[in-house]
C-alpha cells in the first residue's frame, strides 16, 4: 500500500470511529456536541469520497475496510459510551494524524492533487488546532493582562 492508499485507509477508520463517537456520546452539552460530531463524520465522509475517487483516477487501489483495519488495527475504537473530552480528544489527534498522512501522500501525486491534499490538510489543522482545542479548552492561550498606571 503506497502513502496515498494508506491515507485513504486511515480516513476510512477515522470515519467509522467518528460515526461511533457520534452515536455513543454522553453527558454535558449533549445536543450541540452530538451535532458537531455529526458534522465531523459528514465532513470526513466527503473528503474520503473525494480522495478515493481521485486515487482511482490516478490508478491507485481503493483500500477495503479489511485492508484499513489490518493496517490501522490499533486505531479502531470500541463502541462504548464516551464523554465529550474523550470524544473530541480523539478527533483532535485523528485530524492531526490525518493531516500528516495527507502531507506524506503529496509525494506520490501530481501538483493539482497536491493542492487538493493541502486544502484538506489546512481544514483539518484548522479544526484541530483552533476549534477543537478551544472547545476542549485544553491549550487555548489566555490574553495577556497589562497593568496601566493612570497617573502617568
Question: What residues fall within each predicted segment?
Answer:
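Leucine-rich amphipathic alpha-helices with coiled-coil/heptad-repeat character
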Residues: 25, 51, 55-58, 62, ...
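Acidic/histidine-rich alpha-helical segments that form the ligand environment
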Residues: 14, 72-123
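A structural signal for alpha-helical segments
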Residues: 2, 6, 28-39, 83-86, ...
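Short acidic DE-rich linear segments
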Residues: 142-152
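Helix-loop segments that flank and shape redox-cofactor active sites
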Residues: 14-39, 101-114
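Conserved alpha-helical segments that form or flank metal/cofactor-binding pockets of metalloenzymes
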Residues: 31-67
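A structural signal for well-ordered alpha-helices, especially hydrophobic packing surfaces
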Residues: 4, 15-22, 48, 52-55, ...
Amino acid at each position: 500500500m503506497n502513502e496515498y492508499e494508506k491515507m485513504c485507509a486511515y480516513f476510512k477508520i477515522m470515519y467509522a470511529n467518528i460515526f461511533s463517537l457520534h452515536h455513543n456520546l454522553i453527558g454535558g452539552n449533549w445536543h450541540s456536541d452530538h451535532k458537531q460530531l455529526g458534522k465531523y463524520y459528514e465532513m470526513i465522509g466527503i473528503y474520503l469520497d473525494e480522495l478515493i475517487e481521485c486515487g482511482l483516477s490516478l490508478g491507485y487501489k481503493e483500500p477495503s475496510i479489511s485492508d484499513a483495519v489490518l493496517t490501522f488495527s490499533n486505531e479502531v475504537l470500541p463502541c462504548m459510551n464516551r464523554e465529550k473530552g474523550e470524544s473530541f480528544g480523539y478527533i483532535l489527534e485523528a485530524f492531526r494524524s490525518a493531516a500528516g498522512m495527507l502531507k506524506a501522500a503529496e509525494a506520490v501525486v501530481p501538483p493539482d492533487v497536491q493542492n487538493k491534499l493541502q486544502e484538506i490538510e489546512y481544514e483539518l489543522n484548522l479544526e484541530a488546532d483552533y476549534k477543537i482545542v478551544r472547545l476542549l479548552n485544553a491549550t487555548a492561550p489566555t490574553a495577556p493582562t497589562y497593568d496601566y498606571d493612570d497617573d502617568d
